[in-house]
Amino acid sequence: MNRAKYVLLLALIAVVGAIIPQARTNGLFVIASFPSLVDDLELIACPGDRIDYLVPYGVDPHEYTLTPSDIEIIKKADLIVTTGHTSFEAKISEMAEKGEIKARVIEIPKIPGIVIRKNPVLGTPNYHMPIYDPENFITYMEYLAREMARLNPSCKTYYFERISSIRKQVERVVASTPKLSIDAVADSPVVQYAVEWIGIKLKYLVVAEHGLQANPDLAVVEKALIEGKIGLVVVTEQYRSKYSEWLIKKAIETGIPVLLIPSPMSKGTTIEKLRYVSLQVASIASSIQNYNVSAEHSRVNRRFYIIDYVAIALGILVYALMLTAIWCREK
């Protein structure tokens, strides 16, 4: 009888073990569509998690096509993170919808709470790395932590502890960054999320979108710089184009400060890039304030000059009328 109970107990344990999912012991396999996403993923990864990427460094992701080896890799992934705006990323999402891959696919623009800004020139949504904005970045990382904890419950505490540290670091950067209120021109839309949280409003873009030609009327941008309608030039640091160099040259000629922004496609965590932006803003904040004072002084002077010219013209007119009246009386 005891033997029968023992056999029954073993059978029950086997059945329960088959029903209840076992804790993951080998970590998650996470794939990033862009290599620039990897460093942020590694901030939160639990020991045992593996992080890899698809597009090689230096390759334009807008022109990239999935290779057979890419397909094999993503079929093994547990989680895939994409920016959700290139053709090869759309293919990955399509494969997930059709059930061709088992991975959970996260498209950054579709994460609840992510704010997508409008391209200041085209008025269309700007999908170029919205996580460069501090609030979007925290929203993104918290969402990742929850998804990774769901897929790998054994590391739930670790993921959430990492998120707490990340949030505090970002909040410190935001608190220490001088806030501005200034209109700017930038070389491309990839810098929009990196600067607008500071109060820098992009009014002009030399290149409005990837694949488009430069603004056909650069004279408009140059005129805005000369007339003081623009108080700051924003340039992508690592991947400068000839238009970036043109902007820097015009900024020097007009005495306007230049803010250099790490490309969102470059290596390094978003926190490191935000720290760099913060230091850059702090270093030029006084010159921006001086420029604003100077620009306002110039506008005031222009108003006074106009008033002076009008007064002189009226004086001449009155004098001419007096002479005319005297001449008429003498006749």
Q: Which residues fall in each region the model found?
A:
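N-terminal Sec-pathway targeting helices
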Residues: M1-L10, D308, I326-C328
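Bacterial N-terminal signal peptides
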Residues: L9-G17
